[in-house]
């Protein structure tokens, strides 16, 4: 592994040298040094006040490099280094103290040098199809000052101000190490918690994000300012650190008590789903927190529909903005900020503290023993429940400390909430070895460096896809994780049965027939609700698909939205050329293809790792679609042709409605017959006891493959119907919140229950699309016009709490019934 990493860095470095040295091999005449030559640094802003930083390098009266950065929507800086070293033929000349040039398709730069030490200018930036958090069109007015180099003797040789290939490589490494250190900070808590319960905590990302929000809120509440005496600043920040660690520990212990303790020893998937429900609830807490703050920017939450604002208060910059290379008069043309060194040092300090705690303290030794297995730990007298609780408290405290360092480094909180936000931290924890803090640090730094190298030498828009692909490779290569083979949680009940609602024979069939008749009659009685009901029936189809995988086979597919969205995109591109029957077949095949990939993963991974792997697969497919120009990027594809069959276009809303209803009825009937068949009984036997089913002749890998292929095929058919009948597709169809909504529908209706799929999907969609809007309108009419009472409460904004509590309570109540 070490040799592979070393060879990777060497190859990338040689590629960088070959691509940047070649232009300079052309002989050129030496030119006299210009008074404008040197490093320039300045700031600017857009018309709406968005701050930018600008760095220029001038050599021989030519612009040889330009770098700019700004804060993205999630609070993390976006840095454009693509033009940090321009090829010789692309370097614009400064004529009459001015230059204007299109450095690329996404950047137009102009500048006027008022003197030899001051310049102003304008940047026109088109940042698209890279990181969505950075995307946008920006018009930036900036001003910059020339950086005065350290005084040298006249006899010293004059050094070029342009960075050479080696310096460029080192600069990228520094960016990567600082970003990787931030990732490693979050991974420390992940690895400590996971080592005891061996199930991913999907709410950990929300704990970390809320701790960063607490840090910025408390700093602003106390009013800590840069002009305070140093000891007073240090004392105030130390108090904030203690509060952040306390909040992190408290939230993390709460997650353990509510999401892990009730299911201990019974199921792997139940706590995973429960933490997803708590992720919804914690995000709702972030929204409530926001209402008490005076400023914020749009944030992200990947687990729920919509992207409302989350707490993102800015704070003063307490870390000195100095370049240590210039301050120490080092002979290198690179930038090493004090803040970069600070975050790397603090990551090392926290990792060392965690390693010392695990090796020297009684609790740490108990956690290490527990990571090897619960039964062995109990045999040597360890209190399992108490040790797990302490591990969560420790992991939460480290999440609070990491949140404190993150907020100081970026001067604002982490803006990405939800289950996805902790995914890359889990990659670092898995790569470094579960329960190994130093491994989490090294892998976090490695991921940061690989990301920076990919941003510069490849393309930034593919970096997230590269990291997600890395996670998939890690899972298939080392299914049990690196550095830990212990099984801390032993399941005694099959994963799907704990989520299954009790069936009642003929009563269930009667309800199923009643629902189909009602869906067929409602458009004739009330045509106005056809669009909402058609939307609900598409989600019924998706719920039927996930029901096959989760409710019957016990495999949680958190990437089912990828099959849905990919088939929708294929339909949008080809529906005008093929009839609806052909497109339904193609959509099913597209979904089935992703099902084959999931089936391969299922053959190598246990249930909870499989869930995380499918989550990563869904995000990977979405990122690839965003990066493809013909797919429309973030804007999607509109104006999709209406479905047609035998030269008859189904243009009317009623025609589209009954088309979807017929497909849903056929899918429900087929699903019911399949579950009752020999194949369905084999799936149920497999999920109840894999070893017993295998001894009876059930092919484990083949059975899971068939289940996941059929599940994804149904999702593909749903995607085709969505694109054909709603005439628009977008990347958010493949977003994680769609998979989460489908999961909620399955759990609410009862996993393994065809009628439950109808009930769950109809309940969620009608609540979200019909009941809540009407209730909000009614509340606005009756709400008193009284300033003391306040404005009308936004009950639509409470949807996240409602989804989370439904998901959590349904899993909890059914788990208790099974016990």
Language-model features, listed with the residues they occupy:
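C-terminal motif of bacterial Sec signal peptides marking the signal peptidase cleavage site
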Residues: 13-16
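Transmembrane alpha-helices and adjacent helix-loop boundaries
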Residues: 205, 239, 265-319, 324-327, ...
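N-terminal glycine/threonine-rich, aromatic-flanked beta-hairpin/loop signature
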Residues: 46-94, 120-122
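Edge beta-strand at a domain terminus
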Residues: 23-29, 36, 82-93, 120-154
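Mid-bilayer segments of alpha-helical transmembrane spans in multi-pass integral membrane proteins
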Residues: 245-250, 275-292, 340, 352-353, ...
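Short, hydrophobic transmembrane alpha-helix segments
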Residues: 166-167, 191-200, 221-226, 231-238, ...
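Transmembrane alpha-helices
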Residues: 181-188, 378, 383-406, 419, ...
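Bacterial signal peptide processing site
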Residues: 18-20
């Amino acid at each position: 592994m070490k040799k592979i990493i070393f060879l990777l860095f060497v190859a990338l470095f040689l590629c960088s040298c070959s691509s940047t040295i070649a232009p300079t091999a052309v002989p050129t005449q030496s030119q006299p040094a210009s008074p404008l030559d040197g490093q320039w640094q300045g700031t600017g802003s857009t018309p709406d006040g968005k701050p930018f930083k600008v760095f220029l390098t001038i050599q021989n009266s030519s612009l040889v490099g330009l770098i700019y950065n700004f804060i993205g929507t999630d609070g993390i800086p976006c840095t454009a280094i693509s033009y940090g070293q321009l090829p010789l033929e692309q370097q614009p000349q400064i004529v009459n103290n001015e230059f204007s040039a299109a450095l690329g398709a996404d950047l137009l730069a102009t500048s006027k040098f008022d003197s030899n030490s001051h310049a102003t200018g304008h940047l026109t930036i088109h940042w698209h199809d890279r990181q969505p958090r950075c995307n946008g069109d920006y018009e930036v007015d900036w001003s910059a000052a020339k950086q005065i180099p350290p005084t040298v003797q006249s006899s010293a040789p004059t050094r070029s101000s342009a960075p050479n290939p080696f310096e460029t490589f080192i600069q990228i490494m520094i960016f990567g190490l600082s970003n990787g250190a931030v990732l490693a900070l979050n991974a420390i808590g992940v690895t400590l918690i996971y080592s005891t319960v061996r199930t991913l905590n999907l709410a950990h990302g929300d704990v970390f994000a809320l701790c960063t929000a607490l840090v910025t809120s408390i700093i602003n509440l106390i009013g800590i300012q840069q002009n305070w005496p140093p000891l007073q600043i240090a004392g105030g920040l130390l108090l904030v650190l203690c509060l952040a660690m306390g909040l992190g520990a408290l939230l993390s212990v709460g997650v353990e008590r509510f999401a892990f303790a009730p299911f201990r020893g019974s199921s792997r998937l139940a706590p995973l789903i429960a933490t997803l429900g708590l992720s919804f609830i914690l995000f709702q807490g972030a929204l409530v927190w926001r209402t008490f703050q005076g400023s914020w920017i749009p944030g992200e939450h990947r687990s729920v529909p919509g992207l409302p604002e989350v707490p993102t208060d800015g704070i003063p910059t307490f870390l000195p903005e100095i370049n240590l290379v210039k301050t120490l008069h080092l002979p290198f043309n690179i930038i090493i900020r004090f803040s970069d060194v600070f975050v790397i040092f603090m990551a090392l300090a926290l990792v060392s503290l965690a390693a010392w705690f695990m090796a020297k303290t009684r609790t740490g030794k108990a956690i290490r023993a527990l990571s090897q297995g619960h039964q062995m730990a109990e045999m040597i007298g360890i209190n399992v429940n108490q040790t797990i609780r302490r591990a969560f408290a420790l992991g939460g405290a480290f999440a609070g400390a990491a949140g404190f360092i993150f907020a100081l480094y970026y001067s604002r909180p982490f803006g990405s909430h939800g289950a996805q936000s902790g995914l890359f931290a889990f990659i670092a924890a898995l790569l470094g070895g579960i329960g190994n803090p130093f491994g989490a640090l090294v892998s976090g730094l490695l991921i940061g460096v690989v990301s920076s190298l990919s941003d510069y030498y490849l393309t930034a828009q593919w970096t997230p896809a590269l990291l997600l692909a890395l996670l998939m490779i890690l899972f298939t290569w080392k299914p049990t994780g690196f550095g830990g083979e212990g099984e801390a949680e032993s399941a005694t009940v099959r994963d799907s049965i704990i989520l299954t609602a009790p069936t009642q024979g003929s009563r269930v069939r009667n309800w199923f027939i009643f629902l189909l008749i009602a869906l067929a009659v409602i458009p004739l009685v009330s045509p106005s609700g056809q669009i909402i009901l058609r939307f609900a029936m598409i989600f019924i189809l998706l719920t039927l698909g996930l029901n096959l995988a989760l409710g019957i086979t016990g495999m949680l597919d958190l990437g089912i939205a990828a099959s849905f969205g990919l088939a929708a995109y294929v339909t949008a591109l080809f529906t005008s050329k093929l009839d609806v029957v052909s497109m339904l077949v193609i959509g099913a095949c597209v979904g089935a293809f992703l099902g084959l990939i999931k089936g391969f993963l299922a053959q190598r991974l246990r249930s909870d790792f499989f869930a995380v792997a499918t989550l990563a697969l869904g995000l990977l497919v979405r990122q690839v679609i965003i990066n493809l120009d013909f797919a429309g990027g973030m804007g999607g594809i509109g104006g999709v042709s209406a479905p047609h069959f035998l030269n008859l276009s189904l243009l009317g809303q009623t025609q589209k409605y009954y088309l979807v209803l017929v497909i849903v009825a056929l899918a429900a009937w087929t699903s019911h017959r399949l579950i009752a068949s020999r194949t369905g009984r084999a799936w149920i036997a497999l999920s109840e006891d894999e070893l017993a089913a295998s001894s009876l002749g059930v092919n484990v890998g083949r059975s899971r493959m068939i289940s996941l292929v059929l599940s994804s095929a149904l999702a593909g058919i749903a995607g085709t119907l969505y694109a054909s009948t709603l005439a628009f597709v977008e990347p958010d169809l493949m977003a994680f919140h769609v998979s989460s909504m489908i999961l909620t529908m399955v759990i609410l209706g009862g996993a393994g229950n065809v009628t439950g799929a109808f009930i769950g999907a109809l309940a969620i969609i009608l609540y979200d699309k019909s009941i809540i809007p009407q209730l909000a309108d009614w509340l606005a009419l009756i709400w008193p016009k009284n300033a003391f009472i306040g404005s009308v409460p936004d009950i639509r904004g409470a949807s996240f709490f409602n989804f989370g509590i439904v998901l959590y309570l349904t899993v909890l109540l059914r788990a208790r019934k099974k016990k």
